[in-house]
């Protein structure tokens, strides 16, 4: 990148007039990624925010948002919503939008980080799990941030380019990480573009994207995302609802919170997995033959510790977050299909041989944990460890004890474990359903623990 790019990237025609009217040929010489930016053209930018950040943008009594409207002669709004997300809408020319974003970014908070920027040597404790990183802790603009841009689904191809050439070039020229989520936001035609990096770079990247999509007409129907239709079962790259137990209120956390900006090979079937910030590729888990049902992580893991099995569940109260974990290990699965009234999953799997354990955790003949990543920091979850995938099966008659009425139980398990959990429909002629779990090793073991407890507690109570 050229040393003068920051000046070209963020011109201020009011205070630095010498940069306000630069010849087009100079801009092309200075920046390899050419843009046909028309500063007089009004465009609309929509950014997906955590609801808790709306107050910082609006300010007390609307002071901040009024100042942005007045100072930049722009339309700026953050409509209210009942969920963990809101949309920041800015209508102005592209250069002005960039200046407004530079004002807004330092006021935002990022979800679920260590309580101190320097506390990177250990995992957060349970009491720290709801702490957030406020960008205001940093001086200047030398810190990493990320924004979620909303675009119409028909515009995605213009950003990706042929075989990903455009998005690759955009990453290289702006020195940002970019992920275009595959699934649309709930009940809409919008897709999320997650852009991360230094604030100046992120803003420059957004300006280039706005320039790209402003030249492309929208194809098909347009249904902008309404955050009131928030639905966490959609893996679209938004924010997930979690609860701050100390304050008794819902807060939003990034759905991406478990992965990085990398790519995962396409899978077969299923919805893209939310825990990873992959590329624009399909992020569905790899599917393999149904393994036999696993037992509780404690005895099972110790029995076959030389195989790629999840470790025992952490001690109660020692997890990243504290939850009511009813149905303690050892409780019986009353009425479970395939087991007698006096038999548990644990007692059944204690008779498994090492080869049976290996078969249970090795779909497609490889490790049950899917280490699909491509360099960089991308494949590692924000709380430590790579993003991995494993599969288990349950008798289809027990699926209701996990899913719950309206899917509430499985949603809660996703919230508590931090893992992505997908339950496939049973194959024709099969009595089992495959559960695919994706996340860090800790998230997977917590998810398995909660799934088993749910079966124990609700077996025989179908909804």
From Swiss-Prot:
Indicate yes or no for the key word Phosphoprotein. yes
| Residues with Phosphotyrosine modification | 380
As stated in the Swiss-Prot or TrEMBL entry, residues carrying the post-translational modification Phosphoserine are 36, 75, 116, 214, 216, 284, 379, 420
Q: Where is this region: Interaction with ZIK1?
A: 209-337
Glycyl lysine isopeptide (Lys-Gly) (interchain with G-Cter in SUMO1) crosslink location in chain: 34, 163, 422
Q: Which GO terms describe its cellular component?
A: anchoring junction; axon terminus; catalytic step 2 spliceosome; cell cortex; chromatin; cytoplasm; cytoplasmic stress granule; dendritic spine
Q: Which residues carry this modification: N6-acetyllysine?
A: 34, 198, 405
- For the modification N-acetylmethionine, which residues carry it? 1
Annotated sequence repeat ranges: 54-76, 59-62, 245-250, 257-260, 267-270, 295-298, 324-329, 399-421, 404-407
Placement of covalent cross-link Glycyl lysine isopeptide (Lys-Gly) (interchain with G-Cter in SUMO): 422
Q: Where is this region: Necessary for interaction with DDX1?
A: 1-276
The modified positions for Phosphothreonine read 39
GO terms (molecular function) for this protein are:
actinin binding; ATPase binding; C-rich single-stranded DNA binding; cis-regulatory region sequence-specific DNA binding; double-stranded DNA binding; heat shock protein binding; identical protein binding; lamin binding
Q: Where is this region: 5 X 4 AA repeats of G-X-G-G?
A: 59-407
Q: Where in the cell is it found?
A: Cytoplasm; Nucleus, Nucleoplasm; Cell projection, Podosome
Region: 2 X 6 AA approximate repeats; residue ranges are 245-329
One GO biological process term: modulation of chemical synaptic transmission
Q: Where is the composition biased (Low complexity)?
A: 252-266
Identify one Pfam family in the record.
KH_1
Which region ranges are annotated with the description RNA-binding RGG-box?
236-273
| Keywords from the UniProt entry | Acetylation, Activator, Cell junction, Cell projection, Cytoplasm, DNA-binding, Glycoprotein, Isopeptide bond, Methylation, mRNA processing, mRNA splicing, Nucleus, Phosphoprotein, Repeat, Repressor, Ribonucleoprotein, RNA-binding, Spliceosome, Transcription, Transcription regulation, Ubl conjugation
State the PANTHER family in the record: KH DOMAIN CONTAINING RNA BINDING PROTEIN (PTHR10288)
Report what the protein is called: Heterogeneous nuclear ribonucleoprotein K
Its source organism is Rattus norvegicus (Rat)
